[in-house]
Amino acid sequence: MTSAVLDWMVQDSRRLAECRHDHPFSLLGPQQLESGQWVVRAWVPEAETVELILDGERLSMQTPHHPWVFEAECSRDPGHHYKLQIRRGGIEHEQFDPWAFRHEWMGEMDRHLFAEGNHHHIWRRMGAHRCQQGGIQGVMFCLWAPNALTVSVIGNLNSWDGRYHPMQQRLGGIWELFVPELEEGHFYKYEIRTQDGHCYQKADPYGFQHEVRPDTSSIVSHLDGFQWNDDAWINSRDRRNPLDQPISVYEMHLGSWIHASADDPFIEADGTPRPPVPAADLKPGARLLTYPELADRLIPYVKEQGFSHIELMPITEHPFDGSWGYQVTGWYAPTSRYGTPDEFRAFVDRCHAEGIGVIIDWVPGHFPKDSHGLAFFDGCHLYEHADPRIGEHKEWGTLIFNYSRNEVRNFLVANLVFWFDQFHIDGIRVDAVASMLYRDYLRPDGEWLANEHGGRENTEAVRFLQQANHVLFEHFPGALSIAEESTTWPMVTQPTENGGLGFNLKWNMGWMHDMLDYFELDPWFRQFHQNNITFSIWYTYTENFMLALSHDEVVHGKSHLLHKMPGDDWQKYANTRALLAYMWTHPGKKTIFMGMEFGQRAEWNVWGDLQWDLLNYEPHAGVHRMVKELNALYKQEPALWQDDFDQYGFQWIDCNDNRHSVISFMRRESTSGSWLVVVANFTPQSHSHYKVGVPISGFYEEIFNTDAAKYGGSNLGNLGGKPSDEWGIHGYENSLDLCLPPLSLMVFKHDPKKSLAEVTNKERA
């Protein structure tokens, strides 16, 4: 061996010891010498002795170049089945040599697709994967960090010492290392050394499980071991158009729905208690429920109440409870606060078994600056823009994804596919879409950067959203993709091929603001604001709208829904019932936040749980009962949902009686031609002979009334229904002479075969 080669060996060994070597395979593992002989070099920091075990022989390994680089010569290629007998700190153990496994995990096609932003299953390559290499079981680690000087795997496999497991740099900024015989459950991070000498410890961006907060390590976890039982559900979902279905969503935060006592721990299958995850410092002794416990308690509740879907506020891993989950650090992992990934899979499986769809909030608009997360990931602005005028939300203290970078876009698009593929979710609600679409969102003049055309539109984000929705529906045609978009950006729910963003539903923020502004008014003043409750119909067919009363409306001093209402307690409950009933009979799919279904009094607090004791009080139980029966009515009457996005589905009877604050309209469906008459009185003044025009003569059964005694109302109504009179009004030749209860909404169904006597006898029975 020449002196030059010896010098190179010494320098390379020193670079390894100093964590500055980006190609350890060039030095370590089996290497063929010029003589034709082979040498095995092993990197074993702080070892006292190392022996090479090959074909049953033990060869003592020497350290001619560095105290931690052990080598031994052999006459043939030893492959990767040799072992190392290591003595360190007086303790001996055997292991396979990680640098004997040279197979590239990311193939050429993988790298090509990833580089162009089109590898929709990149999570099958990136991250930590239990797999076999050359017949040996272990974990393959794979990371994208193109600007890093070196990357090491650290964790409880090496006492968090970055010198032990340096990774090999591949083409395209990919780093790989196979650690043989490593099992699931190991905690790990990546130690990234930058070109300017800094060192960062980062959680795995593609990690499939992470530690419970406040700890931040990733955990080696499998992907494909869960046995699903929902094939029939998935097949049925992907054959249907979800817009033609009744959709009534229960939005919720898993950690603040209901708590358990820390003195009553969750018991594992082997009989051992699971360490409780504290709910909040302000609530000592309370713990979060686990995914299995939530499956046992939440799913029956949602089914009993008649909701079609659960919408979960972000369950991707996040370090801070106070972010409500919207500041994500673990994009490819359900939060460990409530249990394991497989336990969340089982939760979704149980939902599907009970006929309940699962929607999750997805947050591709920004990410936090936590040191273990994506921020300044490899010593450069890898995932975010470098210029804070387009790369930072200063008001939120978060960073904005660089959608122009193919690999970043790929990270997000593949993440979308991942949640549908791996966790069988049925839909997403994309948070804060407006913040993505506008470069000047929440920015004063001079603090934002115009696009390439000089405008404020974020064209890169537009292309990203179009790609994400196109890929989603290509893979999962029956999915829901819901936009929380608070502006008048056009064509949000138009297909991408028509130039739209490609969502199939959009939250109707205008309807929400108009309704809450109206219902917060003293009823006497409502006559001057009739437009608030009628204006939405003028634009409701411009998009596929979902009506949402969400978590954002019951926090930060806004009061919960019940306490937004004017008047005494009776009027507050009546107003709440009337608003919810108007929501259910108005065109558009439905979403309400947890607690609204029974008249929660206190504002939502992420560190608390709902006021379930209120159900012991009849007014709250009445609201609860009404929401359940509203959902039942909604499902059984196609006129309330089948033509939500067709103008045929809605017809005003009278929207101009602002003096009485009364509105009346019809909901219709085109398949069977059925229709309903809806009449609402939004003042405390009842009316005993109120005329409403109807298109056909006959008997009109009162099938729903928010003023029913069972809901907490005054029990005024129409004794089960009314026959029509030949009294023309509202452009119709027939009309109903109705009793309108105070602060109420009623639904009538025409049935020429029924009479008042038949309905009355049925009620008595």
Curated annotation (Swiss-Prot):
A Gene Ontology term for the protein's cellular component: cytosol
CDD domains, alphabetized: AmyAc_Glg_BE (cd11322), E_set_GBE_prok_N (cd02855)
Entry annotation: catalytic residues: 431 (nucleophile), 484 (proton donor)
EC number(s) recorded for this UniProt protein: 2.4.1.18
Biological processes per GO annotation: glycogen biosynthetic process
Keywords: Carbohydrate metabolism, Glycogen biosynthesis, Glycogen metabolism, Glycosyltransferase, Transferase
Methyltransferase listed as a keyword: no
Catalysed reactions, semicolon-separated: Transfers a segment of a (1->4)-alpha-D-glucan chain to a primary hydroxy group in a similar glucan chain
Membrane spanning stretches: none
Enzyme class: transferase
Metal-binding in keyword set: no
Molecular-function GO term, any one: cation binding
SMART domains in UniProt: Aamy (SM00642)
Domain of life of the organism encoding this protein: Bacteria
Pathways involved: Glycan biosynthesis; glycogen biosynthesis
HAMAP family: GlgB
Family the entry assigns: Belongs to the glycosyl hydrolase 13 family. GlgB subfamily.
Record note on quaternary structure: Monomer.
Role according to the record: Catalyzes the formation of the alpha-1,6-glucosidic linkages in glycogen by scission of a 1,4-alpha-linked oligosaccharide from growing alpha-1,4-glucan chains and the subsequent attachment of the oligosaccharide to the alpha-1,6 position.
The protein's name: 1,4-alpha-glucan branching enzyme GlgB
Native organism: Synechococcus sp. (strain CC9311)
